[in-house]
Amino acid sequence: MARKYFVAANWKCNGTLESIKSLTNSFNNLDFDPSKLDVVVFPVSVHYDHTRKLLQSKFSTGIQNVSKFGNGSYTGEVSAEIAKDLNIEYVIIGHFERRKYFHETDEDVREKLQASLKNNLKAVVCFGESLEQREQNKTIEVITKQVKAFVDLIDNFDNVILAYEPLWAIGTGKTATPEQAQLVHKEIRKIVKDTCGEKQANQIRILYGGSVNTENCSSLIQQEDIDGFLVGNASLKESFVDIIKSAM
């Protein structure tokens, strides 16, 4: 079945009011049909309102993290309830950097997704293997464990997007070849099929998120089971529009 392509800009902990204004101006100049392509920008949370006001309505926006806790005495957290109240549409869950620096676990990812879905937020859920795990031929074993930790929670497979992040390729300039990425994406779809059913596996979108740039995006997007990108550093440049174009 034809799945709607999805391109996400994860700005991580970057940006100023002025740089965001310049970047969104260049994004707005790109003409695309949002009924055929989802483009979602994830700024730093405190820049969310500024970014949303600057971007044209054809773009969607989200935040890079959400709390597994509800409202209450959780200093520094942003609950799914608050995100919903602010009309935030998307959240990123389980990004490699959250797992690495903030020690988030598969159980944390599950609880965050549960809170997000309860509040009708759409989620990009990330997972992937380390270089050591890849070299030990444990890629599929690791990814199966990560995906099965949360996939049973999904009831609307249009509202949850999977993002495969080979950890060894994030911010390193290295990237999986299109063939390597496709092989893993195919296995991810099989995991969803075995757990949830064939219809759901064919419906869910799976993004690639390992050092995507203007040089490799066109060959990656041609792969059957790659439905778009989660882009980090390259989304902070005006040339990000060329990555979007590869999915048009």
From Swiss-Prot:
Changing residue 96 to A: 2-fold decrease in substrate affinity. Pathway: Carbohydrate biosynthesis; gluconeogenesis; Carbohydrate degradation; glycolysis; D-glyceraldehyde 3-phosphate from glycerone phosphate: step 1/1. One of its GO terms (molecular function) is identical protein binding. The keyword Isomerase applies. Changing residue 73 to A: 3-fold decrease in substrate affinity. GO terms for biological process: gluconeogenesis; glyceraldehyde-3-phosphate biosynthetic process; glycerol catabolic process; glycolytic process. D-glyceraldehyde 3-phosphate binds at residues 10, 12, 171, 230, 232-233. Keywords: Gluconeogenesis, Glycolysis, Isomerase. Its EC number is 5.3.1.1. It catalyses: D-glyceraldehyde 3-phosphate = dihydroxyacetone phosphate. Transmembrane segments: none annotated. The active site is at 95 (electrophile), 165 (proton acceptor). Changing residue 96 to Y: 5-fold decrease in substrate affinity. Changing residue 96 to H: 6.7-fold decrease in substrate affinity. GO terms for cellular component: cytosol. The keyword Nucleus does not apply. PANTHER family: TRIOSEPHOSPHATE ISOMERASE. Catalyzes the interconversion of glyceraldehyde 3-phosphate and dihydroxyacetone phosphate in the glycolytic and gluconeogenic pathways. Homodimer. Belongs to the triosephosphate isomerase family. This is Triosephosphate isomerase. It comes from Plasmodium falciparum. The lineage of its organism: Eukaryota, Sar, Alveolata, Apicomplexa, Aconoidasida. The gene is TPI.
